[in-house]
Amino acid sequence: MRLFIIRHGDPDYAHDSLTEKGLREAEALAEWFADVRLDEIFASPLGRAQMTAAPTAAWKGMEVKILPFTAESMDYMASFSAQDDIGYTYSVKGGVSDYRDGSGRFEERSATLAEMIKGSDEFLAGYGMERRGGIYRAFGTCEKRVAVFCHGGFGAA
């Protein structure tokens, strides 16, 4: 399996869309993917990820399938410490303030992360991958090439 994880183009967070720059980035990415084999295209349910995926899907004549578990979580912006399955400890004090929306309403971290992990595990299992500790390993052969258009808040969480 070859997995392309793509963060959306330059965002207009207030309208859950892309700026003019973000639209140009999405078009440039579609041109880059023109000569790259893709078997499936997925995106978060949020507009900015779907708008980034749309030009690539149009160039390829493909459908964009929605993956709800890839929606952006703002949990990573709250202060936390966590230890992963392979022994690393991460501490973030005050989160990443650049993206705060001012609402102060952050999800309960463990529940959101559990949903993302479960969704990721189920998704990747469909392509012959299995989580063992903090690492995914192949338990079968899969030649698929898959693009997932999502968010920094998905990858950071």
Regions found by a protein language model. Give the residues of each.
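Aromatic-acidic/polar surface patches that form glycan- and anion
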Residues: 18, 45, 109, 113, ...
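A generic secondary-structure signal marking the coil-to-beta-strand transition
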Residues: 1-2, 146
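Short, flexible active-site loop motifs that bind/organize anionic cofactors or intermediates
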Residues: 13, 106, 145
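Active-site-adjacent alpha-helix immediately C-terminal to a catalytic or transition-state-stabilizing loop
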Residues: 124-157
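Short, active-site-adjacent cap segments at secondary-structure transitions
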Residues: 48-50, 73, 155-156
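Phosphate-handling substructures
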Residues: 61-133
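Short, functional N-terminal and low-complexity linear motifs
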Residues: 17-24, 83-89, 148
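Active-site-proximal alpha-helix that buttresses catalytic centers in soluble enzyme cores
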Residues: 2-68
